[in-house]
Design a protein with these regions (language model features):
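Histidine- and aromatic-rich ligand-binding microenvironments
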Residues: 6-7, 33-34, 90-92, 112, ...
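Alpha-helix capping/helix-boundary segments
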Residues: 10-11, 37-38, 74, 96-97, ...
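Active-site-proximal, substrate-binding regions of enzyme catalytic domains
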Residues: 38-68
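Active-site neighborhoods of divalent-metal-dependent phosphate/nucleic-acid chemistry enzymes
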Residues: 66-109
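Acidic, PIN/NYN-like endoribonuclease modules and their adjacent C-terminal/linker elements
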Residues: 98-128
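Short active-site oxyanion
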Residues: 1-2, 28-31, 64-66, 103-107
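Short, well-structured N-terminal submotif of metal-dependent ribonuclease cores
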Residues: 1-33, 46-58
Length: 128
């Protein structure tokens, strides 16, 4: 049974051993991630570490995450969150994670402190 939906920042915290990474590791074995957020993580690894996509895929596959495709339903759900999250500075990727969490009826797990101030009816756990 799945425990949460990971934001890119949460997975990047694990990869970089950043503050809060231990809280994320506790949830990794049952975590989901939206394909948008997986792409964000892959892009950061390519940019920061110069890894090839094959190397990134190999590295990320060790976490055995279940990837949720970002489909039309989630696209509209993420768009609907824009007016409610704009002032907090949330990105498209952030809204994709929140929309996925809402659709799966699971909490979102993030390292982004700005999410603490949100009142969206979506459970959010901040690891920092």
């Amino acid at each position: 049974m799945s425990s949460c939906v990971l934001d890119a920042s949460a997975l990047l915290a694990v990869i970089g051993c950043e503050t809060g990474w231990q809280s994320v590791v506790e949830n990794l074995s049952n975590a989901l991630i939206c394909s948008v957020n997986l792409s964000e993580v892959a892009a950061k690894l390519a940019e920061r570490e110069g890894l090839t996509i094959d190397d990134i895929h190999l590295r990320l596959s060790q976490y055995e995450l279940r990837v949720i495709p970002f489909d039309e339903r989630l696209a509209y759900a993420a768009a609907a969150l824009r007016p409610k999250t704009r002032q907090a500075g949330l990105s498209f990727g952030d809204r994709a994670c929140l929309a996925t969490a809402a659709a799966c009826n699971l909490p979102a797990l993030t390292a982004e402190r700005a999410w603490k101030q949100l009142d969206l009816g979506i459970k959010v756990n901040v690891v920092r």
